[in-house]
Amino acid sequence: MATKKAGGSTRNGRDSEAKRLGVKRFGGESVLAGSIIVRQRGTKFHAGSNVGMGRDHTLFATADGKVKFEVKGEKNRKYVSIIAE
């Protein structure tokens, strides 16, 4: 005979897979053209010079060089640029 009563069911117990978002190459790091710099949802960071934006807002290098993060404009937006070496 069972010494424990049957447990009830639950509607919890699920979680989504982590999306691995965030900065992949930091300021001052050397990158090659095509390297992913930031994976993001929306435009937390905006594309500066020598940086392209994918349709999922991923920022990537369009030229070889060093990564530079800067805040500029009236709205204090964060821009990511590549400074060619």
Swiss-Prot record:
GO terms of biological process kind: translation
InterPro entries: Ribosomal_bL27, Ribosomal_bL27_CS
Domain of life: Bacteria
Region (Disordered): 1-20
One annotated Gene Ontology cellular component of this protein: cytosolic large ribosomal subunit
Keywords recorded for this protein, A-Z: Ribonucleoprotein, Ribosomal protein
Pfam families, per database record: Ribosomal_L27
GO molecular function, one term: structural constituent of ribosome
Family: Belongs to the bacterial ribosomal protein bL27 family.
Protein's name according to its UniProt entry: Large ribosomal subunit protein bL27
Protein species of origin: Pasteurella multocida (strain Pm70)
